């Protein structure tokens, strides 16, 4: 009797790799017999022994068996299987008769081939959207290859990286000079013989790194900052010298300080023709909208995502012990000493409520008579003591408030009024009285960089509670997001902010920057700051165009402000569009969607999210082109998403969709920096979620911040404004009163357990954690990012592999330089014969060694699972929807 070939056990961890299709069994058996003269049974030749659990398992050619091989459980009806899943989109006026009973797009994607050669050609929608995205990202130079800072040979990295084993507590520059044996002359022997000055754990020579030149002990910054940090040794003049020296060594490249030639102007015009027009963007946008509104595609996506979630659970059951063993086999590396990046830490909320109260209380006791504010209209000067006289009765002591200076009432007012009405327009004069005036002065003095004391308090806060803490931890890093502010007097915000950074030496290895843009065109229009939407864009981008085109000589006479601004921009990673529930929504007149920005007045109506995104994208594409020509880093685009799922978008003419969908589709097409909110993605159509998975677009989750913000939708301050505050109704009632909104849509409240980031992590989306705004998080520790990971680990029972994968993803998706990514997680953009990982559907990152787990402690078994599962999904898509060649 002929023996039956048994299939490997489902209990094996390598089942998926060792599975054999039924029709391949006989061929395999014949090959084995021919190689061994037929004397040995094929089962004896198996390198892997069959377990006892397999004795009752016989390979049967069933439908389920075939689908397990394909990795697609029973998601489709047999009729659909026979027809190869027929929700294939066909563009009716480009693809023959367009006969498809499930989805026929009435919109033609831009630059799609037309003519007889495309007749009866079916399009794979996933591949088509992928090529759309690649076109937009490549045209704006947001991809990793176009960004010179990922080139470790050409990029000017300054300050020089710290040594591999550097530790904050071992750096002698930060130690008390009384504890050192060195005297002022460098004599450590007592014999009078001078020895070389070698301060710190790292001892480079003077000729290789000027950054560690000898300085006497003591703080190099200004003010009363009492904590040490590496940035106090930053020297702008030294940066200028080394920067110019680096440029002189670059052969056959355009110098960033040389005149902007006419040849480059022609290159710019040629480059900008590659940027899709607004009409092309509208066509592509409409195509994706129809795609995600297809019931068939949403059903397929829903089942595939459910399959991915269940597959990860099965993978965990089968491989959790192997992952734990692999974690333990990596010496000297765990979650705590793996790099992790907070990619969206808000400068306006970078410290906790307790820390801010303690800092203000300390200043009140140390310098109560210091002048900290001057009224722009009356020139009246106020001291710290004077600030607390506002809102106090005659029987109260102005400073008898104690450590409850920053209470929930202030936080509500700061978030809902100050950040919206005053922070974004610094020139606006506040006509407030009472407690509201005290709140305004506290925010202006302690939480603004452009004020009477030149932002000294905010600089001290940032150094003491952010930079110092991050540098001491060494393994925690942050991309700090700062709001772009609009000056009615035409002042350059970039220049002001870079001057503030360099004045107080807010430079650190652990800090990079993001620039956030708010949708406040109606507000600026009402205040006569701008007269059309183009002027709004000019306020943001004209200073950057001027900087990149300015004619400057290559010598030490270069303007220090220009060099300082260039240094700041070299540390900018992303430009973000902030989309909030409070953004003005209702229109007075319905302007044509194709109206150009210079003609968009519309009585101050707010342009749609898509208008903001496209024209910011287009301007950023020009900036990136100029910067890449000048050997400077390029900047990626990111965006938030509307928290309301019930607000209809005004960008649709023939199609109806929400603001959430509009924001997500814009991110899908225009952004390579990722999505800054996870909740709206989870609440929308499953087709969009599946596209974000297939393209591996980075997503940021801030569970603690999202819970804290959404739980206080109706703030205490707004409820009790008439009781708590005194308003000056005589001077300016519009300023004093809070205008009621006609918008009755209310975002639903969330709890931490309902945050979707964990499910998305299991599915395989490129997700990472952020602390975002610590001021509203009720943070209880000095390390809010670790606190974010710890809370997630406690609630969801994350294992070390999960935590290390989240931290590794945060580094891979961050805007840090390629040198640091290679050093921290062992990846680079240059092609290598090792493991390859795609980010955003655009950038391929290659491992620099065969096994890089020593750097990040993510086992290869987890990384292979993610890679093979993603490849399997793309194979599924191509198998069921066809494959097309590149269109662009």
Swiss-Prot record:
GO terms for cellular component: cytoplasm; cytosol; mitochondrion. Disulfide bonds: none annotated. The modification Phosphoserine is found at residues 9, 41, 178, 180. It comes from the Eukaryota. Residues 23-34 have a biased composition (Basic and acidic residues). Residues 1-42 are annotated as: Disordered. Keywords: Phosphoprotein. Belongs to the metallo-dependent hydrolases superfamily. Adenosine and AMP deaminases family. Present with 1100 molecules/cell in log phase SD medium. This is Inactive deaminase YJL070C. It comes from Saccharomyces cerevisiae (strain ATCC 204508 / S288c).
């Amino acid at each position: 009797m002929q023996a039956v070939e048994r299939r490997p056990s489902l209990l094996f961890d390598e089942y998926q790799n060792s599975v054999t299709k039924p029709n391949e069994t006989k061929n395999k058996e014949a090959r084995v017999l021919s190689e061994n003269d037929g004397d040995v049974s094929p089962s004896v030749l198996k390198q892997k022994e069959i377990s006892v659990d397999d004795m009752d398992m016989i390979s049967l050619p069933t439908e389920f068996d075939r689908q397990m091989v394909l990795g697609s459980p029973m998601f489709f009806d047999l009729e659909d299987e026979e027809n190869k899943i027929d929700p294939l989109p066909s563009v009716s006026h480009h693809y023959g008769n367009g006969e498809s009973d499930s989805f026929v797009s009435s919109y033609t994607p831009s630059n799609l081939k037309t003519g007889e050669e495309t007749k009866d050609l079916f399009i794979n929608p996933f591949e088509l959207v992928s090529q759309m995205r690649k076109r937009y990202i490549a045209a704006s130079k947001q991809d990793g290859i176009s960004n010179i800072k990922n080139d470790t040979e050409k990029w000017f990295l300054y300050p020089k990286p710290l040594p591999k084993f550097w530790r904050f507590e071992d750096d002698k520059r930060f130690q008390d000079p009384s504890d050192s044996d060195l005297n002022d002359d460098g004599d450590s022997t007592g014999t009078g013989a001078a020895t070389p000055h070698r301060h710190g754990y790292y001892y480079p020579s003077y000729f290789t790194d000027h950054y560690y030149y000898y300085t006497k002990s003591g703080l190099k910054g200004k003010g009363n900052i009492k904590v040490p940090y590496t940035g106090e040794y930053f020297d702008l003049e030294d940066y200028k010298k080394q920067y110019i020296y680096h440029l002189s060594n670059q052969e056959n490249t355009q110098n960033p300080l040389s005149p902007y030639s006419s040849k480059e102007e022609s290159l710019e015009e040629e480059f900008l023709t590659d940027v899709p027009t607004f009409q092309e963007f509208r066509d592509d946008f409409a195509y994706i909208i129809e795609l995600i509104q297809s019931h068939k595609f949403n059903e397929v996506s829903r089942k595939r995502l459910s399959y991915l979630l269940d597959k990860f659970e099965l993978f965990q059951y089968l491989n959790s012990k192997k992952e734990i063993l692999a974690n333990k086999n990596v010496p000297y590396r765990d979650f705590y000493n793996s790099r992790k990046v907070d990619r969206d830490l808000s400068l306006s909320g970078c410290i906790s409520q307790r820390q801010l109260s303690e800092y203000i209380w300390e200043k009140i006791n140390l310098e109560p008579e210091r002048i900290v504010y001057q009224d722009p209209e009356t020139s009246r000067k106020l001291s710290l003591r004077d600030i607390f006289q506002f809102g106090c009765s005659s029987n109260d002591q102005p400073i008898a408030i104690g450590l409850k200076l920053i209470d929930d009432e202030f936080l509500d007012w700061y978030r809902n009024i100050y950040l919206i009405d005053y922070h974004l327009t610094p020139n606006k004069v506040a006509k407030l009285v009472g407690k509201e005036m005290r709140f305004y002065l506290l925010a202006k003095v302690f939480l603004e960089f452009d004020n009477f004391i030149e932002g000294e308090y905010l600089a001290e806060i940032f150094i003491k509670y952010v930079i110092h803490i991050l540098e001491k931890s060494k393994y925690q890093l942050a991309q700090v997001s700062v709001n772009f502010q609009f000056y009615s007097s035409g002042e350059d915000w970039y220049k002001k902010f870079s001057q503030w950074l360099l004045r107080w030496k807010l430079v650190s290895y652990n800090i990079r920057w993001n620039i956030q843009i708010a949708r406040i065109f109606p507000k600026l229009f009402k205040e006569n700051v701008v007269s059309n939407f183009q002027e709004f864009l000019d306020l943001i981008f004209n200073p950057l165009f001027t900087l990149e085109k300015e004619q400057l000589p290559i010598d030490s006479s270069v303007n220090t402000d220009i060099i300082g601004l260039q240094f700041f921009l070299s540390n900018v990673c992303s430009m973000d569009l902030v989309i909030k529930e409070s953004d003005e929504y209702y229109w007075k007149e319905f302007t044509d969607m194709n109206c150009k920005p210079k003609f968009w007045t519309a009585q101050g109506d707010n342009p749609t999210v898509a208008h903001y995104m496209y024209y910011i994208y287009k301007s950023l594409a020009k900036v990136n082109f100029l910067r890449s020509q000048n050997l400077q880093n390029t900047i990626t685009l990111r965006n938030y998403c509307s928290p309301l799922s019930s607000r209809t978008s005004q960008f649709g003419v023939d199609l109806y969709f929400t603001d959430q969908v509009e924001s997500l589709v814009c991110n899908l097409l225009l952004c390579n920096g990722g999505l800054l909110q996870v909740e709206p993605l989870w609440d929308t159509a499953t087709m969009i979620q599946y596209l974000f998975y297939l393209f591996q677009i980075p997503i940021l989750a801030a569970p603690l911040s999202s819970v804290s913000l959404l739980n206080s939708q109706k703030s205490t301050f707004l409820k009790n404004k008439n009781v708590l505050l005194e308003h000056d109704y005589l001077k300016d009632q519009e300023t004093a009163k809070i205008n009621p909104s006609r918008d009755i849509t209310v975002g639903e409240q969330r709890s931490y357990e309902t945050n979707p980031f964990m499910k998305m992590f299991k599915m395989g989306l490129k997700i990472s954690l952020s602390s975002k705004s610590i001021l509203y998080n009720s943070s209880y520790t000095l390390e809010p990012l670790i606190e974010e990971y710890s809370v997630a680990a406690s609630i969801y029972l994350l294992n070390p592999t999960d935590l290390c994968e989240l931290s590794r993803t945060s580094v891979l998706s961050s805007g840090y330089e390629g040198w640091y990514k290679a050093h921290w997680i062992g990846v680079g953009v240059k092609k290598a014969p090792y493991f390859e990982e795609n980010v955003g559907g655009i950038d391929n990152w290659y491992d620099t060694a065969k096994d890089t787990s020593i750097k990040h402690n993510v086992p290869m078994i987890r990384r292979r699972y993610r890679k093979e599962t993603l490849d399997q999904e793309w194979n599924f898509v191509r198998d069921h929807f066809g494959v097309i060649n590149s269109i662009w």
